[in-house]
């Protein structure tokens, strides 16, 4: 009977340890995804801020050569 208790405690301990590791990896993955989304948003903002400058440059060229 004592052997079964020890085995059960071992199984429960290993299960909890595995669950803890999985939760930590999940949190890290979610954090990396969030950081990637933030990087993508900042790149998009930088790109969108260049559009007015490009339009001004094109309009200047059109007025100069047109």
Swiss-Prot record:
Chloroplast as UniProt keyword: no
- Tissue range of expression? Expressed by the skin glands.
Q: Which InterPro entries does this entry report, sorted A to Z?
A: Frog_antimicrobial_propeptide, FSAP
Q: Spell out where the chain crosses the membrane.
A: none
Keywords in alphabetical order: Amidation, Amphibian defense peptide, Antibiotic, Antimicrobial, Cleavage on pair of basic residues, Secreted, Signal
Residues where Phenylalanine amide is found:
65
State the source organism's domain of life: Eukaryota
Q: Which BP terms from GO are recorded?
A: defense response to bacterium
Q: Which residues form the signal peptide?
A: 1-22
* Propeptide residue intervals: 23-44
Q: According to its UniProt record, where is this protein located?
A: Secreted
Q: Where's it mainly located?
A: secreted
GO cellular component entries: extracellular region
What does this gene product do?
Has antimicrobial activity. No hemolytic activity.
Q: Which family does it belong to?
A: Belongs to the frog skin active peptide (FSAP) family. Phylloseptin subfamily.
Q: What is the protein's given name? A: Phylloseptin-H2
Q: Which organism is it from?
A: Pithecopus hypochondrialis (Orange-legged leaf frog)
């Amino acid at each position: 009977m004592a052997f079964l208790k020890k085995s059960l405690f071992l199984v429960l301990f290993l299960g909890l340890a595995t669950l803890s590791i999985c939760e930590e990896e999940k949190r890290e993955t979610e954090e990396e995804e969030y950081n990637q989304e933030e990087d993508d948003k900042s790149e998009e903002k930088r790109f969108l801020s260049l559009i007015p400058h490009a339009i001004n440059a094109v309009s200047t060229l059109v007025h100069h050569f047109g």
